[in-house]
């Protein structure tokens, strides 16, 4: 079933479609509410019928608009590609409704053939990289990242930084930087939630690891200065101020994002979402 429809934007009609909880991974920090091996799978006919209904609904809304809506569908899970009918379904979506812009959130752990099918049928990909995978799994994911990059496909990476594999995560981030691949360094869970720390769905990072996050986000949030004519590179020696927790340094993640919320007619900063 789909989990959300966003029709607040002026020109876009966006659907977040949860295709099920099942996943090919079993990450220690991912609770059963995010992934499992037993949740039921929706039949292909029901998937197609639901998609047909979404398109009809958006077209009905277009009758009362000067300009038609742009229909976006984001497939998520679990791992969407574990659904046995997934590739048949996205092929149907592309061939029947070529105007739909689609995205998939995936772990990238599948064959080259499936990766090429995704590139052909899905407009863009958000790939979550997890270092808890086996060496064989991670080798497969890296190969697919390289394939998407070399193919000029539209994708980005959510790089999940595991506290116990931090050096490996840094090495991979440096590889992304070398290739010019877009990625976000993401802490795992909410380190300010004690129950999440106890059950392992959140990681507590060392000061050195937090410093790495701070430097990453500071660099990514600031526009790069333009070099004067004839200058190839510009270097800066400015050091950002030290901070010691995810809350104080800010966190670009869906589960702990710094937001401004209005409370009693006052705007205040909220850490927990």
Model-derived features: where do they sit?
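Radical SAM enzyme core and accessory elements
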Residues: 1-9, 264-268, 273
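Canonical Radical SAM [4Fe-4S] cluster-binding loop centered on the CxxxCxxC motif
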Residues: 2-49
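Residue-level signal for mature regions of secreted extracellular proteins and peptides
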Residues: 16, 20-23, 73, 246-247, ...
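Short cysteine clusters
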Residues: 23, 27-30, 253-254, 258, ...
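Radical SAM/AdoMet-radical enzyme domain recognition
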Residues: 51-56, 60-74, 83-176, 182-183
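Active-site beta-strand/loop signature of hydrolases that rely on acidic residues for catalysis
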Residues: 77-78
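Radical SAM enzyme [4Fe-4S]-AdoMet core and its adjacent flexible, acidic
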Residues: 124, 128-264
């Amino acid at each position: 079933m789909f989990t959300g429809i966003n029709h607040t934007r002026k020109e876009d009609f966006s659907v977040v479609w949860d295709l099920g909880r099942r996943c090919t991974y079993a990450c220690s920090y991912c609770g059963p509410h995010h992934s499992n091996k037993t949740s039921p799978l929706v039949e292909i006919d029901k998937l197609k019928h639901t998609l047909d209904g979404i398109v009809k609904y958006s077209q009905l809304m277009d009758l009362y608009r000067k300009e038609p809506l742009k229909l976006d569908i984001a497939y998520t899970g679990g791992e969407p590609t574990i659904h046995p009918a997934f590739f048949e379904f996205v092929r149907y979506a592309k061939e029947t409704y070529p105007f739909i812009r689609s995205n998939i959130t995936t772990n990238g752990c599948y064959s080259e053939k499936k990766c090429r099918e995704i590139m052909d049928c899905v407009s863009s990909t958000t790939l979550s990289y997890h270092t808890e995978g086996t060496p064989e799994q991670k080798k497969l994911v890296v190969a697919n990242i390289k394939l998407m990059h070399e193919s000029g496909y539209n994708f980005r990476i959510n790089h999940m930084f595991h506290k116990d594999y931090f050096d490996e995560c840094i090495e991979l981030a440096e590889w992304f930087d070398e290739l010019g691949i877009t990625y976000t360094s993401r802490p795992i869970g909410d380190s300010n939630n004690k129950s999440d720390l106890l059950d392992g769905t959140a990681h507590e990072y060392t000061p050195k690891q937090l410093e790495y996050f701070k430097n990453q986000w500071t660099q990514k949030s600031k526009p790069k200065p333009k070099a004067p004519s004839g200058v190839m590179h510009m270097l800066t020696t400015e050091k950002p101020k030290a901070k010691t927790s995810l809350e104080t340094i800010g966190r670009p993640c869906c589960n702990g994002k710094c937001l401004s919320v209005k409370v009693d007619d006052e705007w205040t900063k909220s850490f927990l979402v």
